[in-house]
From Swiss-Prot:
Function: Ca(2+) release-activated Ca(2+) (CRAC) channel subunit which mediates Ca(2+) influx following depletion of intracellular Ca(2+) stores.
Protein location: Cell membrane
GO-annotated cellular components: membrane; plasma membrane
Source organism per UniProt: Xenopus laevis (African clawed frog)
Protein name, as recorded: Calcium release-activated calcium channel protein 1
Lineage: Eukaryota, Metazoa, Chordata, Craniata, Vertebrata
Membrane topology: Multi-pass membrane protein
InterPro entries, per the entry: CRAC_channel, Orai_sf
Family, as annotated: Belongs to the Orai family.
GO molecular function terms attached to this record: store-operated calcium channel activity
Gene name of the record: orai1
């Protein structure tokens, strides 16, 4: 064992003495190497975080799309129209169009998730840091974001509209009065139920839109802060590189004039 610092002996020098013996260019070189290694590890960690985020988005999109598209198909098949009731033409057209668009949007998101997710899962299960380069999540980033937006934003809004239209189609014929020319129209219990569901769903849809906009702005602000932090780290690396490039330049001594 080596004695403590301050004891006069011929043992190895203390760490403070070693630090004093290191010249300034060597210290700059070591700092640059350390920062480069940290930057490489941080880039790999960032790639792995993007991979896990893409995988989570695809899983959420596939589950949500399968659930909501299945509900829309069952709702269209199982709904029973009253043959003796005169439905408004616009109601049936809106219900059919909303159901079709809802199923198409969610099937598109489900198709993207089904095609990309197995390739990402295969890479994420390999216990190797460099295997992240084999994942297609960087190249398919726009497709993943599009599928996630279709499934969680557009698909959810269409689902809310589907619920409202389904309530009108289902409850409108209930206790509908037969109005003659001498009688005034009255709101039936079925119409009241449909109006109530619409009055509840419209504010909820507005709250959903406000939350989606607020969440998107918060996410963009967080990404912007992270970009500024990475730019500052790159500026520090560039400064250290500049100091390393000029460490061999001769220092000009001041000239004294008589």
């Amino acid at each position: 064992m080596y004695p403590e610092c301050g004891v006069e002996t011929k043992s190895r020098p203390c760490s403070k003495q070693l630090q004093e013996e290191v010249s300034y260019p060597e210290w700059i070189s070591r700092s640059y190497v350390e920062l480069m290694s940290l930057n490489e590890h941080s880039m790999q960690a960032l790639s792995w975080r993007k991979l896990y985020l893409s995988r989570a988005k695809l899983k959420a999109s596939s589950r949500t799309s399968a659930l909501l598209s299945g509900f829309a198909m069952v709702a269209m098949v199982e709904v029973q129209l009253e043959p003796n009731h005169a439905y408004p033409p616009g109601l049936l057209i809106a219900f059919s169009a909303c159901t079709t668009v809802l199923v198409a949007v969610h099937l598109f998101a489900l198709m993207v998730s089904t095609c990309i997710l197995p390739n990402i899962e295969a890479v994420s299960n390999v216990h190797n840091l460099n295997s992240v380069k084999e994942s297609p999540h960087e190249r398919m980033h726009h497709h993943i974001e599009l599928a996630w937006a279709f499934s969680t934003v557009i698909g959810t809004l269409l689902f809310l509209a589907e619920v409202v239209l389904l309530c009108w189609v289902k409850f409108l014929p209930v206790n509908s009065p037969k109005i003659s020319s001498n009688e005034t129209s009255a709101v039936s219990s079925g119409q009241a139920a449909a109006i109530t569901s619409t009055a509840i769903m419209v504010p909820f849809g507005l709250v959903f839109i406000v939350f989606a906009v607020h969440f998107y702005r918060s996410l963009v602000s967080h990404k912007t802060d992270r970009q500024f932090q990475e730019l500052n780290e790159l500026a520090e690396l560039a400064q250290l590189q500049d100091q390393l490039d000029h460490r061999g330049d001769p220092v000009q001594s001041p000239v004294h004039y008589a």
